[in-house]
Amino acid sequence: MNGLRHRMAAVAAALSVAMMSAASEPETEILRPVTAAYTVEAGSSHIADTYLSPIRYAGWSAGFGYGRMQAMKFSPERWVMALDARLTAERALNRVGNATMWYWGVEARWAMMRRVRPLAGLTVGLGVGPGLKAGCLYSQRNGNNPASAKVALTVDLSAYAAWNIRVGRLPVTLCYRPVVPLTGVFFAPDYGELYYEIYLGNHSGLARMAWWGNYFVLDHSLTADLHFGNTSLRIGYSGQVLSTKASDITSRMIRHCAVIGVSGEWLSVSPRKKISPKARMIHAL
């Protein structure tokens, strides 16, 4: 009996020492730098909107974009967030060249994605999030209906694939980002309905449920970040296909653009708190 008591006391003492030792060890600090990019885009635009005209228009597109990605705080190894915003301006002419159509728009979306690393240097992520698209087409030739609003609030399916490689001695990050709305609501007036009528109170049926049969958008980009130093050069391609059909109105907008900009990783550090030498950094890409 005495031997059993001695063994139990020894086990209890060992557990106490282990618990005190674990409690005394500080948790490893996790650092989550933000991968951000500022870009400009320029390329071609193709527009067809039967609310304004049955004729197709073609011209140029230009825009400014901002994007950021960061590992999530609650599970940084498995989850990342992405925020993207873009301002766009487009000018297109009809085939004869005697009519002009303008488009101005803003887009913003956020997504939380689950990521995996199937191969060394390769990261793949998939998730969902909200998206907002608001813009306006304008044709001066139309007297009664000179403008066509494009507004949608959607739930988007977002994905990305990032591959960290070296070209010679230069580190390069290749990234492909596709986004497709799954569902949501979008603005769709009746065929021939004047905006003045809407202003007077004719609001029936303006908001339509979006699905791939009446509202389809593919927004995708392929970029390469050339890491020359703390700040990287981003080059690549950005494209968007928008197709809507509601109230006998068909709209098609296609954009292909070259992308150039700067990107890099930024980390907010408090001057009152030193970074632990044991801190662990988890990147978004």
Spell out what each predicted region is.
Residues A48-R56, A92-T100, N142-A149, L206-A210, ...:
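Extracellular loop and loop/strand-boundary signature of outer-membrane beta-barrel proteins
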